[in-house]
Amino acid sequence: MSQPPKVLLLYAHPESQDSVANRVLLRPAQQLEHVTVHDLYAHYPDFFIDIHHEQQLLREHQVIVFQHPLYTYSCPALLKEWLDRVLSRGFASGMGGNALAGKYWRSVITTGEPEGAYRTGGYNRYPIEDILRPFELTAAMCHMHWLTPMLVYWARRQKPEVLESHATAYGDWLRNPLPHGGR
């Protein structure tokens, strides 16, 4: 049996200690040898990102997972800074910027509202696909394959068994993250 591809899980939550849902979701990833869990807020509490280190991590992995809560229709501030600084022209995009070409991007996102809030006419006025479009466009700019996001709606209000079910599905996906086995 072949080895699974190396997965870099970029975890960005400024209040991780208070996020039961994200702690439950991280558990299976932390048990897999081919998955590197990289907590951005733990590594960069001062927001001074080591760009070269981060780019080297990206080079070493085939699947990049961005796990974070949905903050104001986007991601937490440190992840936004990371995206702007690390995915620079000449590295991930623009002339000669093909370091991530052919790699896979998956967003794993927790929300504070129920699924029905993310639809045309719902509380947030737009479907979640529209809200996540900037991430999809960033993946395209980096010549990466966009994988369907995993969403845990109303995360803080989910029953423990529902969170465990999401964590199990996440762990199963992490064991074989490439669509069609990578073919």
From Swiss-Prot:
Subcellular location: Cell inner membrane
Reaction it catalyzes: a quinone + NADH + H(+) = a quinol + NAD(+); a quinone + NADPH + H(+) = a quinol + NADP(+)
Family matches, as InterPro entries: Flavodoxin_fold (IPR003680), Flavoprotein-like_sf (IPR029039), K_H_efflux_KefG (IPR023947), KefG/KefF (IPR046980)
GO biological process: positive regulation of potassium ion transmembrane transport; potassium ion transport
Top enzyme category: oxidoreductase
Location, primary (coarse class): membrane
Pfam family of the protein (one): Flavodoxin_2
GO CC terms: plasma membrane
GO MF annotation, one: electron transfer activity
Membrane topology qualifier: Peripheral membrane protein
EC number annotated for this UniProt entry: 1.6.5.2
Domain of life (superkingdom): Bacteria
Annotated signal sequence range: none
Record-linked Gene3D superfamilies: 3.40.50.360
Keywords: Cell inner membrane, Cell membrane, Membrane, NAD, Oxidoreductase
Subunit structure: Interacts with KefB.
Family according to the record: Belongs to the NAD(P)H dehydrogenase (quinone) family. KefG subfamily.
Job of this protein: Regulatory subunit of a potassium efflux system that confers protection against electrophiles. Required for full activity of KefB.
PANTHER family: GLUTATHIONE-REGULATED POTASSIUM-EFFLUX SYSTEM ANCILLARY PROTEIN KEFG (PTHR47307:SF1)
Identification of the protein by name: Glutathione-regulated potassium-efflux system ancillary protein KefG
Gene that this polypeptide is encoded by: kefG
